[in-house]
Amino acid sequence: MSMSLYGDYIVEDETGFATYRFLSDQKAVYIVDLYTVPGARGDGRASALADRVAAEAKELGFTSMIGTVAPSAKGSTRSLRVLLAYGMDLESAGPDYIVMKKEI
């Protein structure tokens, strides 16, 4: 029986979670999903989850963090605001994606 290692790439607490993957060729960690329950939004809990991912990535020698937003997705404006507030800068964009990046 083979087991999934996906659990190795998630941080969570009672208010939310972040899933991520390492992009070795870019020395970056990519935040795949970041979610907090509505009652926990706006108080830094999403940043705390991202900080945990960044700390692990930095310990492993990664130097940046990447996040993406699909402009056509519901809530995309709020998602973009969250990434900007976390200190990410525009890296690139396409017809339905925005890539943000932050040095860690």
Predicted regions and their residues:
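Conserved GNAT acetyl-CoA-binding A-motif
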Residues: 57-72
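GNAT/GCN5-related N-acetyltransferase fold signature
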Residues: 20-22, 36
